[in-house]
Amino acid sequence: MTHQTGIHATTELRDFFAKARNGSVRLIKVIIEEEQLVLGAHKELARRWDVDYDAFVLPLLDEQQPCYVLYRLDSQNAQGYEWLFISWSPDNSPVRLKMLYAATRATVKKEFGGGHIKDEMFGTVKEDVSLSGYQKHVSSCSAPAPLTAAEQELQQIRINEVKTEISVESKHQTLQGLAFPLQLDAQQAIQTLKQKKINYIQLKLDLERETIDLVHTSPTDISDLPKRIPQDSARYHFFLYKHSHEGDYLESVVFIYSMPGYKCSIKERMLYSSCKSRLLDTVEQEFCLEIAKKIEIDDGAELTAEFLYDEVHPKQHAFKQAFAKPKGPVGKRGQKRLIKGPGENGEDS
């Protein structure tokens, strides 16, 4: 699993996540205790999601303690019910806790299952993450809008966390992160990968010059991937994953963000985390390179053929069908009924 801060979920929390994903739980509060992610509180289903939202969410938010809240919506996707992920980081909480919770956010989503999360919100005051705040958030996602107070606070937290000056000339900061410029050879490598003339790119941040540099583009098989992951520094990787799926031959670009946890400085961890989303935006929007899967790891040993396949083609949740009642002989079933009983023809009512 990916644990950029060395923090991971307890067995009890993982078990509760599994239970919650079946739809019986409305809310999960997660906190960090003794360097572990633990269950802080939970709420069972009661009424419609929007009716219970403020009554369930707001009382659980401490004015001095960050936390994560997962709130189950009533909509569903192929993997089951969709969830809202809330990162709560109040103004009065210590900077150290803000940094810790910010750096562990990706781990919580991965532990729960990112495919179940429909929306994310960040809040420093309760109004930001209230039902009204969420509705404004959904509206703002459909069109560009000025930064909210919470978004401005998130920017400032990131600036404080990395403890580095940000000049207008060197990079641009938005809610999505920092934008270090791609060096020319890195841009050329991305174009070459798009043309499928190479199958691997490794990039690194130059923390002094504030640029994204090309490390190498060595030909790489799946068996070589673990050796490409440095054990003492972070990297960005693009890999052209050639494989077969359901009888079709596919060539899928996979983005890998490797971060070996505490072996890197806080500044390095925060800068790599902040630059990642802007790099991906640039690659996908400006270079028009389609990325099939984005993966975060802390150890190259995770990159097996089976792991890559499961990440690119996640197994769908199987829904057990009701037992199909056998049909009687043709022509001897009596008069046709207007309303079918539950379970008939193998369908639930």
Swiss-Prot record:
This is Twinfilin-2. The gene is TWF2. Actin-binding protein involved in motile and morphological processes. Inhibits actin polymerization, likely by sequestering G-actin. PANTHER family: TWINFILIN, TWINFILIN-2. One of its GO terms (cellular component) is myofibril. GO terms for biological process: actin filament depolymerization; barbed-end actin filament capping; positive regulation of neuron projection development; regulation of lamellipodium assembly. SUPFAM superfamilies: Actin depolymerizing proteins. It comes from Gallus gallus. One of its GO terms (molecular function) is actin filament binding. The keyword Plastid does not apply. InterPro entries: ADF-H, ADF-H/Gelsolin-like_dom_sf, Twinfilin. Keywords: Actin-binding, Cytoplasm, Cytoskeleton, Repeat. Residues 324-349 are annotated as: Disordered. It is found in: Cytoplasm, Cytoskeleton; Cytoplasm, Perinuclear region. Signal peptide: none annotated.
